[in-house]
């Protein structure tokens, strides 16, 4: 029988990232459910030597960070987790995940959060600009596409260093619902959701397959249509159940997958909200598109061929993003 505290080599645990694969510091802004869960996942994956959680609520980031750090001997990670109410501890972060903002309540759309969260993200972005001017930003706060715009506008960062977490989450929901309908592993579902992070998102049926088999050969169109609609309202479905908050397990997983692709220079093709400069015939907005992520952040935007219906739906989604963008006050 092994004693408590036996070395990992005896316990058969998986190896974590080496020092050379880590970045020095990743900051999570916001210590609510999404932020705290993101910080825990980042630490468990050892993507940074230090994970900083910053929040205006006194004691909350400190208490949650201490709790997470005390899980390190059990989970087997050495990433240090610290909590703070100021930005000095976040200085020179390589990646910053912005989750700060109020959460949705039943009956609220993501756009209902616009003015309140725009003010919060503006203030956060001003702090980031002065303390971590070389950071890569991953925006999670809603309404996602517009908050990504606010962060880029206020910091002045190039588009390569400002990304929105949207399509990774929406695609995960889409894949989960398909796997459930077919009773197969989620690992075998290949799919992609583009467009704005809202009711006009565009699940690409033409690029959806199960181990290479087109989804249209496996499910009737009515079932596919129902899954597409459930994907679009996936966040609202969770809000309705929770009543006092919104999703955080899947959103945090999505944000961390993006961080991992960047830290480990994986060259992953992930659907993210990116600033368009002519791609897909659009410019001047953040929209979910296939992005190649590496150590420099956004390395390229992949333009895929779309059906006429998908092109029209993407244009409609872009219009839905532009409207609140024009209403936001900076």
What do the PLM-derived regions correspond to, one by one?
Residues 54-94, 322-330:
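Conserved N-terminal Rossmann-fold NAD(P) cofactor-binding segment
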Residues 31-32:
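Glycine-rich Rossmann-fold phosphate-binding loop(s) that bind the pyrophosphate
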Residues 35-36:
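N-terminal Rossmann-fold NAD(P) dinucleotide-binding loop
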Residues 109-175:
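Rossmann-like NAD(P)(H) cofactor-binding subdomain of soluble oxidoreductases
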Residues 74-136:
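Rossmann-like NAD(P)-binding element
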Residues 6-17:
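N-terminal polybasic/positive-inside topogenic patches
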Residues 155-161, 170-330:
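C-terminal substrate-binding/catalytic lobe of Rossmann-fold NAD(P)-dependent dehydrogenases
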């Amino acid at each position: 029988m092994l004693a408590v505290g036996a070395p990992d080599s005896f316990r058969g645990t998986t190896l974590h990232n080496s020092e050379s694969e880590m970045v020095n510091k990743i900051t999570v802004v916001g210590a609510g459910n999404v932020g705290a869960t993101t910080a825990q996942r980042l630490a468990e994956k050892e993507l940074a030597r230090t994970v900083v959680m910053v929040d205006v609520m006194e004691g909350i980031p400190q208490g949650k960070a201490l709790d997470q750090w005390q899980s390190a001997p059990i989970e087997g990670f050495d990433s240090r987790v610290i909590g703070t109410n100021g930005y000095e501890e976040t200085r020179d972060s390589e990646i910053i995940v912005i989750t700060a903002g109020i959460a949705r309540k039943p009956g609220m759309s993501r756009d209902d959060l616009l003015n309140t969260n725009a003010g919060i993200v503006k203030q956060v972005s001003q702090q980031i600009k002065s303390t971590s001017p070389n950071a890569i930003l991953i925006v999670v706060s809603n309404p996602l596409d517009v908050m990504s715009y606010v962060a880029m506008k206020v910091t002045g960062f190039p588009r390569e260093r400002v990304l929105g977490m949207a399509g990774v989450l929406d695609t995960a929901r889409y894949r989960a619902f398909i796997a459930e309908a077919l009773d197969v592993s989620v690992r075998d579902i290949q799919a992609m959701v583009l467009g704005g992070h809202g009711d006009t998102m565009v699940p690409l049926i033409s690029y959806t397959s199960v181990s290479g088999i087109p989804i249209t050969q496996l499910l009737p169109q009515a079932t596919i249509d129902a899954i597409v609609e459930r994907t679009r309202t996936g966040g609202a479905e969770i809000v309705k159940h929770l009543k006092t908050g919104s999703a955080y397990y899947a959103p945090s997983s999505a944000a961390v997958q993006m961080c991992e692709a960047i830290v480990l220079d994986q060259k992953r093709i992930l659907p993210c909200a990116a600033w368009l400069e002519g791609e897909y015939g659009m410019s001047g907005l953040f929209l979910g598109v296939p992005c190649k992520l590496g150590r420099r952040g956004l390395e390229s935007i992949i333009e895929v061929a779309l059906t006429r219906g998908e092109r029209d739906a993407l244009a409609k989604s872009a219009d839905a993003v532009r409207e609140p963008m024009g209403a936001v006050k900076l």
